C-alpha cells in the first residue's frame, strides 16, 4: 500500500466503503495570527479580580468592577478601549506592595475673588471647574473644588480640604502615583478669576511598585503578543526583560513586545533610556503631559498593536492617540526628538487638531554585545515582522507535515505516502516566501532562493536543518531631495 492513511487500517475484510478526511492540504496562503494583549497594573482592594491571574476584559464597566473604581487598571482599560475595541485584551492585576507609599500633592488657593469667573483645576487630565462669584474667599473656592473631586469616584486621587488647601492622595501605592499631573488653566481661555491664585505642589513620595515576579508567574505559558507595563523601575524591568527574552527564544516561541511610557524632562528620559538596551521594550516619552504615563502607555500600545496586527511591516507613524498633549512650550522640537530616538525612546508629534500622534516607534535596543551601534532590532515593525515570519514558517511546517516520515532526496516515494525530503521542505519554504512577498513582508526572491539551505542532519536522521536569509520589507521613513534650481 503506497497511500499513507491516518485512520483506515490495512487489515480490513468487512465491506465496503471507508473514507477519511485529511486537512494537511486544506489551508493555503500565510496564516492568520490571533493577537492577544496583556495589560499589567495595580488593582484596588475594592476590585473583585484575583491578583496574579489574567482575566479577559471587554468593557470599561467590567474593569471598574474587577479592579476598583479609580484604580490604575480601570482607567488604563478605558484608555485602551477608546483607542482599540477589537484586539483581545487581557488584564493581569497586581496588589499594591504592602511596604509601599501613596503619592500626595496639594493645591493651595490664595486671595479673594474681585470678579466673577471660573476656577479650573485639572487632575490626571480630568478638568474640574467651579463658578466663582465676587467676594468668594480662597477657603470657599477650595471647598467647592474638593466637593467636585470627591464626587468623582473614577479619578485616581482622594481629595480632602483644610482651609484654603486641597490635599490629594493617590488611591494606590507605588511610583506611578507620582506621574499624576496637577495644573490649572490648561485649555485656551481659562484663567484665574481676578483676585485668586493657586500654588500647586506636584504629586510625589509614591514608592515601591507591585511585585513584578507575581506578574511573570501570571504570564504562564500563554502567548501574549503585546504587553502593556506601567512600572518602569529598574528591578521590575530587569525581571520582565529576562522573561520576554526567554519567550522570544526558539524553545518557547511565544514572543511579545512590551509597551511603556515615561514622564520626565528630556534629560531625565534620555538618562533613563541609555541605561537600558532592550529589543523587546518600546518606551514613549510623554514629557509634561496632563495624563499619567500609564495612560499614555495604554494608548500607545492600543494604536501600535492594532496596526501591527493588521500588517506587521507597515510603519506606525501618524497613528493618533486621543490624549491631551503637553502645553506648547513643553513640546520637544526636532533636534530633541532626534536625540530621543538615538537614546532608544519613541517619539510623537502633535497634529493640527492638538492630538498626539506617533512619530517613530522604536525599541530600546541600541548597542551590540561589544557596545557598538546596532540597528538590527531598532524598529518595532522589525520585531513584529520577524515574529510573524517565524509563526508563518512554523504553521506551514506543522500544517503540511504533521506526521510524516523523513527520507533523503532522490528516494523513490510512492504516491500518497506521508514522506518528506529536504527538497520537498525547501520547495515549500520557497512557496511560502512568494506568499509573504505578495503580502508585502519580504523581498528579493532570487537572493532567498540562492541562499536557502535545507539539509538532513548528519547526526540525527529524524531532524532537518534550515538556513535562510529573508530580506524584510522596510518602511518609508525619510525622503531627501536636493533641488538644484536654474534661473
From Swiss-Prot:
Cysteine-cysteine disulfides: none
Family annotation (Pfam families): Phage_sheath_1, Phage_sheath_1C, Phage_sheath_domII
Family named by the database record: Belongs to the myoviridae tail sheath protein family.
Function recorded in the entry: Major component of the tail.
InterPro entries found in the cross-reference section: Phage_sheath-like_beta, Phage_sheath_subtilisin, Tail_sheath, Tail_sheath_C
Protein name per Swiss-Prot or TrEMBL: Mu-like prophage FluMu tail sheath protein
